Amino acid sequence: MALPKLTTPTYELEIPSTDEKIKYRPFLVKEEKILMMAMESKENADITQAVKDIVSECTFNKVKIDDMPMFDVEYIFLQIRSKSVGEVSKLKLLCPDDKKTYAEIDLNLTEVKVQVGEDHTNKIELENGMGIIMTYPTIDSFSKSGIKDINASNMLDVISNCILQIYEKNGEKTYDPKDQTKKELTDFIEQLNTKQFKEVQKFFETMPKLKHDITIKNPKTKKESKVTLTGLNDFFA
């Protein structure tokens, strides 16, 4: 005799970058097991694949995970996690005042939003009608390149992966980065002067991020400090 099937609740959310409404469900025991095994391995590729698989399954395979900006995937996963194991996450955060003591806090995951920096734009004017149109890093671009976060050592690789278009004459002439070699893109980026390069960096600094400010109290010094959590890893510290 077949065993009865349990009813799984469904919820709705808006994808931050598009405002598109999608339905999702909590992850099940079999999916939680996949995530736990990936977390135990501490391999970035395993964790990324687990997050992708869970988001895909829990959104009923209705979204194209590989093409989504990283912050969209992180936000969706956070919502799935909050409905699966609880809206409150217990965190241990390093206190900024002495940089050695940890404070335990309860964070309501439903309060965490994707935030965009001031004056953010994906169109970067360089000179004389020439410029770059940028696109956001995807979870796949990070995974394939082995990049965990954006820093000085990998900035050129990240930039070249996120160029959507290079244009001249105010857009009358355009170049598709897919038609260029990696070296050609790197050479182009290295031609930028300091001011132009800072404008490109600003795109990444101000782009949408899973972000939340929280005040923590050092249990030893009793000093209160503001801590900014960014990216999925910070919310499960």
What are these regions (language model features)?
Residues M1-A237:
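Long C-terminal interaction/binding lobes of large macromolecular proteins
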